[in-house]
Regions:
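Solvent-exposed loop and edge beta-strand segments that line ligand/cofactor-binding
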Residues: 32-40, 74-88, 136-149, 211-224, ...
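Long, well-ordered core segments of solenoidal/helical folds
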Residues: 46-60, 110-127, 175-193, 245-262
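N-terminal secretory signal peptides that target proteins for export/translocation
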Residues: 1-8
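Eukaryote-skewed repeat-based solenoidal scaffolds used as protein-protein interaction platforms
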Residues: 108, 112-115, 119, 136-188, ...
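Terminal, non-catalytic domain-edge segments
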Residues: 23-47, 154, 158-179, 205-212, ...
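N-terminal carbohydrate-binding/catalytic regions of secreted carbohydrate-active enzymes
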Residues: 45-90, 94
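Bacterial N-terminal signal peptides
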Residues: 8-22
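Intrinsic, low-complexity N-terminal interaction/targeting segments
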Residues: 61-70, 124-136, 140-143, 194-216
Length: 341
């Protein structure tokens, strides 16, 4: 168990950018629950047309915006698509659903363009960059940050049910899914020969933990690793390698948890204070050498506590979370399933 320094953090006046991005990016995904009649009606067709207008020339969609409510009226050549912040996969799911309901070949063709783009973007080692083509900056790294690669793999897994796909694409999707899982296993960080968790991004060639933005240094990630483990626990008939990866990751989360503290609001501040009734917490980043939490400003210098960094980053990033709680819950269910086999 890790004991942090008690810190006081000012709350931002506005919602964190990551939360805003999630709220916007969920729009296309939420519409999947609508009926076939809705997709065939005026609202459904108008929404599909709006989504189609936002597709980039490569086949992807931009992030941090609602692609469902209004059409894009700018220069299509300037659209920058990405896999980050739930972009592209939700739009593709919508178009697949729209094609099933309407038979609209425009939706079909746009879906296939985006689907092929995802397959093309995958590295030979099974990883994905944040967007494709990735350029030379940190976006080229294999991107687990904010669930990017897991979301792509879930999309490929679910594509088994997509009627819009032909047999050859189904086959390619299955192969890409397998390569992606193998990439996850190879990226898992070994400490003393023991598998632990993952960094938010890994070098696309060496698979080593990699830096992204100045405050996102190579680390053991308490956030992204939770999503990866939950994904691995969803795999049917897991291989011994997947089982070993899950076991190592779950053990790391148990060892890294911060007990006896609560991180939450107190007036206009956010406070980390002693509370023995509080559920466990995890830090966003843990040092690769010491295993202790660290925090970082835009100067790229590690700090031992969050109150040692500036207000802008301190209030604009998720430095603590309850990510491991969902890991423990899913692991208990996973163990029961494995015992039943």
């Amino acid at each position: 168990m890790i004991r942090p320094a008690v810190t006081r953090v000012l709350l931002p006046i506005l919602l964190p950018l990551a939360l805003i991005a999630d709220l916007l990016a969920e729009s296309a995904g939420k519409l999947l629950e609508n009926s076939d009649d809705w997709f065939r009606g005026d609202d459904g067709r108008r929404t599909a047309a709006n989504i189609l207008s936002w597709q980039s020339s490569h086949g992807s969609w931009p992030k941090n915006g609602d692609t469902t409510r209004k059409p894009y009226r700018g220069d299509r050549a300037k659209l920058k698509g990405t896999f980050d912040n739930k972009a592209t996969t939700d739009e593709l799911r919508f178009l697949s659903r729209a094609f099933d309901a309407t038979g609209d070949t425009v939706c079909r063709d746009a879906f296939l363009k985006g689907f092929d783009h995802i397959l093309e973007a995958q590295y030979p080692n099974g990883g994905w960059p944040q967007f494709h083509p990735p350029g030379k900056q940190y976006h080229r790294h294999i991107t687990f940050n904010d669930g990017t690669m897991v979301r792509l793999l879930e999309f490929l897994r679910d594509s088994r049910e997509f009627k819009v796909l032909d047999p050859e694409r189904h086959k390619k999707a299955a192969a890409a899914f397998g390569r992606g899982v193998e990439c996850i296993l190879k990226c898992q960080i070994l400490i003393g020969g023991k598998p632990t968790v993952w960094c938010a991004q890994h070098d696309e060639v060496t698979l080593a933990p990699a830096k992204a933005r100045d405050y996102e240094l190579p680390s053991l990630s308490g956030s992204e690793s939770a999503g990866i483990l939950r994904f691995l626990m969803d795999i049917e008939n897991p291989s011994p390698s997947v089982i070993r990866a899950v076991k190592g990751g779950v053990e790391w989360f148990e060892a890294a948890k911060i007990s006896g503290y609560r991180y939450g609001k107190s007036g206009n501040d956010r406070v980390l204070k002693k509370d023995f009734s509080a559920p466990p917490l995890w830090a966003r980043f843990y040092d690769l050498d010491t295993g202790k939490p660290f925090f970082c400003d835009r100067d790229g210098i590690k700090k031992d506590s969050v109150d040692q960094i500036g207000a802008e980053r301190r209030n604009g990033y998720a430095w603590y979370g309850n990510w491991g709680v969902s890991v423990a819950k899913d692991h208990a269910k996973w163990l029961r399933r494995q015992a039943g086999h």
